[in-house]
């Protein structure tokens, strides 16, 4: 749930206007607006796992500030591996008004896990981090100029190898977009690594599959199906079809790189490729989307940021993955949509039996 610990309004930046483009009313009578989302694993690992990262994180913040001055900053930034305290410096420099953080180091899983996870031994390779406890948070952050009105998050129950040292999980941030009817749900996540976990591939694959089930369960439990949904993060699926394909038919979203590779769905910045080549498996990072209500969403442009500089250096071992989406709606359809109760009650089991009251906008 949203707390002062998970959601921060940066006071010095409160006067800045949210950067969401309103495209007005096309001749067709439909309305539309656009939103850009950057997902970026910033490699904010603590020493001795990585060196020189404080300087790199500050440089990322400075680059986001430059993009803001030029009027080309992403509307939303999804950060993974934001473990270090210098992430606060990055956020301050970048100029985003709202900052939400995912599962903390001490946060624990609530509710029931996947049925087929009962036989998964939580500690099998203690020499590689399993059973040591959590040394860091999930490292997940959401930065936004549009107001964040609610936050939900949970750690993953299952992990493998060195990944178990971080409290990896998933978070959902609900945003109120100016110029759009209602709100939008945005999910950020980081799933178990493959070889970097330092345990057998079969072990890390099993943990990844169970986390995939947990991710889908979380989304289905917390998203509002009447609102557009955007998903991003480090899925750790590069060259790993056994990870990407697991329960793919049950996903409550479409993967952007797969959607845009169809001739019927052209997206600027992504050339069509042979589907047999499965170009969506060339990156660890994915974005995805879904819409079932009166406001539809689809990707329209793909871009890579924070790649190799002219000097040959990189600020992270990942590129930034930027997707621009278009949200469209017919005002008459929105007005005719069935009214919903002004109050929603959700059970809360994390700290004992309780109820969360949500006042709908």
Per-range role (PLM):
Residues 45-49, 153-163, 191-206:
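Surface-exposed cleft-lining segments at the edges of enzyme active sites
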Residues 24-38, 140-154, 165-192, 325-330:
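Beta-strand-turn-beta hairpins that frame and shape the catalytic cleft
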Residues 80, 93, 115, 134-151, ...:
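Conserved beta strand-loop-helix elements of the APE1-like EEP
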Residues 17-25, 217-230, 235-360:
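Metal-dependent phosphoester-hydrolase catalytic domains
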Residues 2-94, 103-127, 132, 137, ...:
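N-terminal, active-site-proximal structural segment of metallo-dependent hydrolase catalytic domains
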Residues 36-42, 60-88, 143, 173, ...:
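Active-site beta-strand/loop signature of hydrolases that rely on acidic residues for catalysis
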Residues 191-215, 239-250:
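Active-site-proximal segments of metal-dependent phosphoesterases and phosphodiesterases across multiple
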Residues 98, 119-126, 132, 147-152, ...:
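Short helix-loop capping/hinge motifs at secondary-structure junctions, enriched
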């Amino acid at each position: 749930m949203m707390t002062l610990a998970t959601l921060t309004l940066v006071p010095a930046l409160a006067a800045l206007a949210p950067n969401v483009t309103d495209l007005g009313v096309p001749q067709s009578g439909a309305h539309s607006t656009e939103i850009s989302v950057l997902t970026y694993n910033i490699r904010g690992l603590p020493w001795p796992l990585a060196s020189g990262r404080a300087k790199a994180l500050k440089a990322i913040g400075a680059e986001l500030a430059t993009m803001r001055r030029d009027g080309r900053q992403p509307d939303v930034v999804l950060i993974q591996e934001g473990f270090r305290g210098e992430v606060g410096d990055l956020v301050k420099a970048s100029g985003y008004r709202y900052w939400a953080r995912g599962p903390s180091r001490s946060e624990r899983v609530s509710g029931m896990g996947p049925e087929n996870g009962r036989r998964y031994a939580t500690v099998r390779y203690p020499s590689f981090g399993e059973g040591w406890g959590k040394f860091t948070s999930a490292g997940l952050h959401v930065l936004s100029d549009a107001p964040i009105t609610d936050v939900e998050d949970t750690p993953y129950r299952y992990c493998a190898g060195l990944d178990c040292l971080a409290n990896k999980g998933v978070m959902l941030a609900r945003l109120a977009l100016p110029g759009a009817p209602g709100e939008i749900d945005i999910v950020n996540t980081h799933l178990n690594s493959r070889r970097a976990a330092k345990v057998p591939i079969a072990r890390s694959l099993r943990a990844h599959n169970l986390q995939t089930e947990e991710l889908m369960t979380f989304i289905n439990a917390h998203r509002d199906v009447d609102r557009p949904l955007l998903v991003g993060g480090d899925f750790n699926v590069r060259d790993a079809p056994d990870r990407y394909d697991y329960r793919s038919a049950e996903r409550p979203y479409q993967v952007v790189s797969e959607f845009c590779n169809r001739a019927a769905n052209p997206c600027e910045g992504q050339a069509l490729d042979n589907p047999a080549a499965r170009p969506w498996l060339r990156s660890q990072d994915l974005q995805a989307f879904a819409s079932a209500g009166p406001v539809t969403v689809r990707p329209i442009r793909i871009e890579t940021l924070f790649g190799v500089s002219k000097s040959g250096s990189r600020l992270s071992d990942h590129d930034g993955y930027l997707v621009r989406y278009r949200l469209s709606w017919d005002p008459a359809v929105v007005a005719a949509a069935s009214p919903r109760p002004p109050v929603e009650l959700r059970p809360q089991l994390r700290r004992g039996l309780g109820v969360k009251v949500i006042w709908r906008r």
